[in-house]
Curated annotation (Swiss-Prot):
The gene is phnC1. The lineage of its organism: Bacteria, Bacillati, Cyanobacteriota, Cyanophyceae, Oscillatoriophycideae. ATP binds at G35, S36, S37, G38, A39, G40, K41, S42. The keyword DNA repair does not apply. Residues 2-244 form the ABC transporter domain. This is Phosphonates import ATP-binding protein PhnC 1.
Amino acid sequence: MISLNKLGVTYPNGTEALHNISIELNQGEFTVILGSSGAGKSTLLRCINFLTYPTSGKVIIEGNGDLNHPKILQKHRQRTGMIFQQHQLIPRQTALKNVLVGRLGYHSTLRSLFPLPKTDQYIALNCLERVGLLEKALTPVQALSGGQQQRVGIARALAQKPKFILADEPIASLDPASSHQVLSNLQKICQEDRIGALISLHQVDLALQYAQRIIGLGKGTILFDCNPSEIKKQQLEEIYQTLSYNPISKTI
């Protein structure tokens, strides 16, 4: 379990990105953060892995302790997979080599300069198979579609043998069919391996379809935290009230 205790982020210019965030994220739970652009979703995800350092509050890992301790942070990052909106892949490298990046945290810097052991390659190939891309293992990722590239990103995160996965707008640049495939793959893998997941989205319909739990975020604060079946239309309208379009009208 990951506990966020009164987490806050204020940038040097005085902008408050997150305010007094207190939540618990459970192993095996598929959670979606729902909110409009600028709500603080990406900042919250990055705080959980200390890619952005909170200016107040704590992130506590069950069984390990406070992430402010360097050794605890290193171990946490090793077992926390990240999936990014822009994939963060090496375009000219094959899908297999990109997935092997997920194994580097298990080796010293010197060892990682050489080809990784066959055991790691088997793990990477298995991860590609689980996202339906084994036949693309030796294909440069720049030759893959956007949806396929994001599935390589999932496989790379899975190769870390994570206890938790953080996904920042993983379907933002994908078409509807690819979006469903990526979320379906991710949900299935997390359920099978009891991996906790926190995924930021702005698509209400997809959050309602795939999430076990939805956290509504607006202007850096939590507006609601509940099961999809408990969400009221008024709560969603509060999140999206500043938008010029209405993503809610056909979802509830």
